[in-house]
Curated annotation (Swiss-Prot):
Organism, as annotated: Enterococcus faecalis (strain ATCC 700802 / V583)
Biased composition (Basic and acidic residues): 1-36
UniProt family annotation: Belongs to the UPF0337 (CsbD) family.
InterPro entries: CsbD (IPR008462), YjbJ_sf (IPR036629)
The protein's name in its UniProt record: UPF0337 protein EF_1180
Pfam family, one: CsbD
Coiled coil segments of this chain: none
Positions of the UniProt region annotated as Disordered: 1-39
Length: 82
C-alpha cells in the first residue's frame, strides 16, 4: 500500500512539475521553469528507483525459491540414500 501511495505521489509531483515548468515558460519566469523541471525530474528519479527496488525484490524472491528447491532436492536425495 505504501508503494502505491509513493507512486501516486511521484505522478502528482511529475504533473505539478510539468505545470510549473509550463507556467514559467508562459510568464518568462526562469526560476519557476527550472523549479518545475527539477520537480518533474526528481519525480522521474524516484519512480525509477522504485522500479529498481521492485526488480531487486523480485530477483531476491526468485533466488530464494531456487535455493529452497535446491535444499529440497538435496533432502530428497539424502532421504533416498538411506
Amino acid at each position: 500500500m505504501a508503494d502505491l501511495k509513493g507512486r501516486f505521489d511521484d505522478a502528482k509531483d511529475k504533473v505539478e512539475g510539468t505545470a510549473k515548468e509550463a507556467q514559467g515558460k508562459v510568464t518568462d519566469d526562469k526560476g519557476k521553469e527550472l523549479e518545475g523541471k527539477a520537480q518533474s525530474t526528481f519525480a522521474d528519479v524516484k519512480d525509477k528507483a522504485r522500479d529498481a527496488g521492485d526488480d531487486l525484490k523480485e530477483g531476491a524472491e526468485k533466488l530464494t525459491d531456487k535455493v529452497k528447491e535446491g535444499f529440497e532436492d538435496l533432502k530428497d536425495k539424502f532421504s533416498k540414500d538411506k
